[in-house]
């Protein structure tokens, strides 16, 4: 996993499988589609969350471009946010709900979480 804190878009199953194996970090998958209005609306808030919670890693997953991963994750609605830690899903937020996503992030971060209030 790179140290670049930009939100990266996963291009294929191999990339997903590599990211999911990372231990010790909270990983958030933003499962979206380009035709999804709520996905576009929440994007700026997701960027803010990725910057506010510096010890998390955010990845975008276009369900139309990587359908096998979307099916494996049982994505039925976009946007869906999946939170993984040590290879296990620890939370799921369905819909464009930034407050619920932030609550899930906070609940799953250990001590030493870095957060800057807005």
From Swiss-Prot:
Pfam families according to UniProt: Thioredoxin
Disulphide linkage map: 36-39
Record keywords: Disulfide bond, Redox-active center, Virulence
Stretches assigned to the Thioredoxin domain: 1-110
Induction, per UniProt: Expression is up-regulated more than 10 fold in toxin producing cultures.
Presence of keyword Disulfide bond: yes
Pathway of action: Mycotoxin biosynthesis
Any further remark recorded for this protein: Gene clusters encoding host-selective toxins (HSTs) are localized on conditionally dispensable chromosomes (CDCs), also called supernumerary chromosomes, where they are present in multiple copies. The CDCs are not essential for saprophytic growth but controls host-selective pathogenicity.
Function summary: Thioredoxin; part of the gene clusters that mediate the biosynthesis of AM-toxins, host-selective toxins (HSTs) causing Alternaria blotch on apple, a worldwide distributed disease. AM-toxins are cyclic depsipeptides containing the 3 residues 2-hydroxy-isovaleric acid (2-HIV), dehydroalanine, L-alanine which are common for all 3 AM-toxins I to III. The fourth precursor is L-alpha-amino-methoxyphenyl-valeric acid (L-Amv) for AM-toxin I, L-alpha-amino-phenyl-valeric acid (L-Apv) for AM-toxin II, and L-alpha-amino-hydroxyphenyl-valeric acid (L-Ahv) for AM-toxin III.
Family: Belongs to the thioredoxin family.
Descriptive protein name: Thioredoxin AMT13
Organism annotation: Alternaria alternata (Alternaria rot fungus)
Lineage, opening ranks: Eukaryota, Fungi, Dikarya, Ascomycota, Pezizomycotina
């Amino acid at each position: 996993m790179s140290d670049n804190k930009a939100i990266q878009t996963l291009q294929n199953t191999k990339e997903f499988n590599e990211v999911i194996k990372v231990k010790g970090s909270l990983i958030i998958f933003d499962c979206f589609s380009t035709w999804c209005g709520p996905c576009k609306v929440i994007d700026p808030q997701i960027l803010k969350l990725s910057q506010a919670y510096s010890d998390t890693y955010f990845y975008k997953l276009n369900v139309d471009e990587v359908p096998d991963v979307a099916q494996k994750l049982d994505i039925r609605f976009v946007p869906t946010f999946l939170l993984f830690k040590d290879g296990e899903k620890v939370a799921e937020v369905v819909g464009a709900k930034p407050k619920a996503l932030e609550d899930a992030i906070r609940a799953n971060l250990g001590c030493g979480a870095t957060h800057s209030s807005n």
